[in-house]
């Protein structure tokens, strides 16, 4: 009986091992596109400091175009030019705790500040998660001030 249950679980539970069938992320020319069967986000690459161009809800066919050319990550009014922009698209297998997803990592630098934005795209989910990681210093970005803004 135990062997039969194990066999049934492997046969019918195997579908969840391929949970990224509808998820995608790719950079073509200067446009980054990420999404799944329900939602799609399109960005202008901008050296890695991406700018949202369009958000599309595929379930109802509605699309919202962003008319601003401001980068999605902004720490000050006068941003330096981004450098070292890179993209990594990695399928992540499911675990006992988390379902499978597609991880899209966008990394770039603003002078001495390194920024990594990690988008998580799940099958059949009408939302795209985003985590932002920072490393380095921002003194040069804020005009070379040595005093922390929190200490004022």
Protein language model regions, located:
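Sec-dependent N-terminal signal peptides
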Residues: 4-15
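Beta-strand-rich N-terminal accessory domains
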Residues: 20-85, 91-151
